[in-house]
């Protein structure tokens, strides 16, 4: 007997599937380049925590293990004074910037930053044990210092980068939860903002929610979140706005090993060990942990203070700065020295500890240089529809809008809107454009008045001219040698005569 197949038949969608188009397909690049650079960017603060007085931050937290996310604001090229007015037609075209080169300059000497905790949950030294630990007392915390994992990172895109970390999840309603149970974990993806902590070697997690004793990690991360860049999510971005390219260098090794004090929430199963007598009858803590170390800091492995040229981005956006924004995210732990300062309370001929107050500060120095290329976009109906699907705010910045579809219903419009005799009317929507990043923290760098076409007057511009083969403009005229006369001389030649001997 014949029977139809039980397998599922998949029918293709009736409409064609939309395809993401690379920016090179509709963006035309010109041969006009501009150089732009920031001023010397400096930051000074306490490396472990912010100092507050009367609920006001007087000294911010500035650590070598924080993300520095620069929000670079560019001028509108459509309102820019161009050297050639015939480059584009404002009725059918719009101009955009393309980032073709950059250099992130770092000041200050190389150094290793030390962090720690005066009350760290360290119980036994399990690397070189002198004896078997018994039951811990009420409080076994000690003062421990360490250095962190070494990281150098630079990410460039026209949208803020994404980071991932593990946070506290939500238990199911049918699960009974007791005090002291291990909380569920949830992978959280969020925007990396300026001042967020990087992964220091203890994992990318929310230490404030997942370590309630505030003693398992050093001071600068025990009450905050450490994020790691979500490279997988940014690489899967269909438009490629968050990550044009990135530079990364990480290294770490485990320096010391010890275990934690406290009750082991999930004891070692009995079938994995044979208990002994005396002090071996009770098993010691099996919660092992290490102290990280970034090892040697050397100038031979530096990612900064050198130019990088963007020929082809990893995504579909090949360096186009939509919205006239560019985000540069920097991490450099090779310059994480924490300076100690001392101030005397009173002058004395003999040294006394109480006569001096000790302080800590961390300083950072940056310099950003860019090469931007002027590009044009022809506003065809197909291109405008695609850009509206990708990012509608781009068309709004270009003073374009889509007309709503016709409404078949008859709408009511009152003459006296403020009258108390009629029902309350809906508030009019705000016409001013809202900044999508107003609730986020970034280090804003305004380059609206820093553009220059004289590339040969700047270090990065001269490197670009040498690399690309373009000729820079010269401001002074050089002397031109007059060409020599090519026609033969009319003076008669003297005949040679032979002399008789």
From Swiss-Prot:
GO biological process, one term: virion attachment to host cell
Annotated localization: Virion; Host nucleus
UniProt key word ATP-binding: no
UniProt-listed Gene3D superfamilies: Major capsid L1 (late) superfamily, Papillomavirus (2.60.175.20)
UniProt biased composition (Basic residues): 492-501
Region (Disordered), start-end ranges: 472-501
UniProt keyword annotations, A-Z: Capsid protein, Disulfide bond, Host nucleus, Host-virus interaction, Late protein, T=7 icosahedral capsid protein, Viral attachment to host cell, Viral penetration into host cytoplasm, Virion, Virus endocytosis by host, Virus entry into host cell
Major location category of this protein: virion
InterPro entries per record: Capsid_L1_Papillomavir (IPR002210), Capsid_L1_sf_Papillomavir (IPR036973), dsDNA_vir_gr_I_capsid (IPR011222)
GO CC annotations, alphabetized: host cell nucleus; T=7 icosahedral viral capsid
GO terms of molecular function: structural molecule activity
UniProt KW Membrane keyword: no
Complex and partners: Self-assembles into homopentamers. The capsid has an icosahedral symmetry and consists of 72 capsomers, with each capsomer being a pentamer of L1. Interacts with the minor capsid protein L2; this interaction is necessary for viral genome encapsidation. Interacts with protein E2; this interaction enhances E2-dependent replication and transcription activation.
Job of this protein: Forms an icosahedral capsid with a T=7 symmetry and a 50 nm diameter. The capsid is composed of 72 pentamers linked to each other by disulfide bonds and associated with L2 proteins. Binds to heparan sulfate proteoglycans on cell surface of basal layer keratinocytes to provide initial virion attachment. This binding mediates a conformational change in the virus capsid that facilitates efficient infection. The virion enters the host cell via endocytosis. During virus trafficking, L1 protein dissociates from the viral DNA and the genomic DNA is released to the host nucleus.
Entry's family note: Belongs to the papillomaviridae L1 protein family.
The protein's name in its UniProt record: Major capsid protein L1
């Amino acid at each position: 007997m014949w029977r139809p197949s039980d397998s599922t038949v998949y029918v293709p969608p009736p409409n064609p599937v939309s395809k993401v188009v690379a920016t090179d397909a509709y963006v035309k690049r010109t041969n006009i380049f501009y150089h732009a650079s920031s001023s010397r960017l400096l930051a000074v603060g306490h490396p472990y925590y912010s100092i507050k007085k009367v609920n006001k931050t007087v000294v911010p937290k500035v650590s070598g293990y924080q993300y520095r996310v620069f929000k670079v604001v560019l001028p509108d090229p459509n309102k820019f004074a161009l050297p050639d007015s015939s480059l584009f037609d404002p009725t059918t075209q719009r101009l955009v910037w393309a980032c073709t080169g950059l250099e992130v300059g770092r000041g200050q000497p190389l150094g290793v930053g030390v962090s720690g905790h005066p009350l760290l949950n360290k119980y036994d030294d399990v690397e070189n044990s002198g004896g078997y630990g018994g039951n811990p007392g009420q409080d076994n915390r000690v003062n421990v210092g360490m250095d962190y994992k070494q990281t150098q990172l630079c990410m460039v895109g026209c949208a803020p980068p994404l980071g991932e970390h593990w946070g506290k999840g939500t238990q199911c309603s049918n699960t009974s939860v007791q005090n002291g149970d291990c909380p569920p974990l949830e992978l959280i993806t969020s925007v990396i903002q300026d001042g967020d902590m990087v992964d220091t070697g203890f994992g990318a997690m929310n230490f404030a929610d997942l370590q309630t004793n505030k003693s398992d990690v050093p001071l600068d991360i025990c009450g905050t979140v450490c994020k790691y860049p979500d490279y997988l999510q940014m690489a899967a971005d269909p438009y490629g706005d968050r990550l044009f390219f990135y530079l990364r260098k990480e290294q770490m090794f485990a320096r010391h090993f010890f275990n934690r004090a406290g009750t082991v929430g999930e004891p070692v199963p009995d079938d994995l060990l044979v208990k002994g007598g005396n002090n071996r009858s009770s098993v010691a803590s099996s919660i092992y942990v290490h102290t990280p170390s970034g090892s040697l800091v050397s100038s031979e492995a530096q990612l900064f203070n050198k130019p990088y040229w963007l020929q082809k981005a990893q995504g579909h956006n090949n360096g186009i700065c939509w919205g006239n924004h560019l985000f540069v995210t920097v991490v450099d732990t090779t310059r994480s020295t924490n300076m100690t300062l001392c101030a005397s309370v009173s002058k004395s001929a003999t040294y006394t500890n109480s006569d001096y107050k000790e302080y800590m500060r961390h300083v950072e120095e940056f310099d950003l240089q860019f090469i931007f290329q002027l590009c044009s976009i022809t506003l065809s109906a197909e291109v405008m529809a695609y850009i509206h699907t990708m990012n509608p705010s781009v068309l709004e910045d270009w003073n374009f809008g889509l007309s709503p579809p016709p409404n078949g219903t008859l709408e009511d419009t009152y003459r006296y809107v403020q009258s108390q005799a009629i029902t309350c009317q809906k508030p009019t929507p705000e016409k001013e454009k809202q900044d999508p990043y107003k609730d986020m923290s970034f280090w804003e760098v305004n380059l609206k008045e820093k553009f220059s076409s004289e590339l040969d007057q700047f270090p990065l511009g001269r490197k670009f001219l040498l690399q690309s083969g373009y000729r820079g403009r010269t401001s002074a005229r050089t002397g031109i040698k007059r060409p020599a006369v090519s026609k033969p001389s009319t003076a008669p030649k003297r005949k040679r005569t032979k002399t008789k001997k």
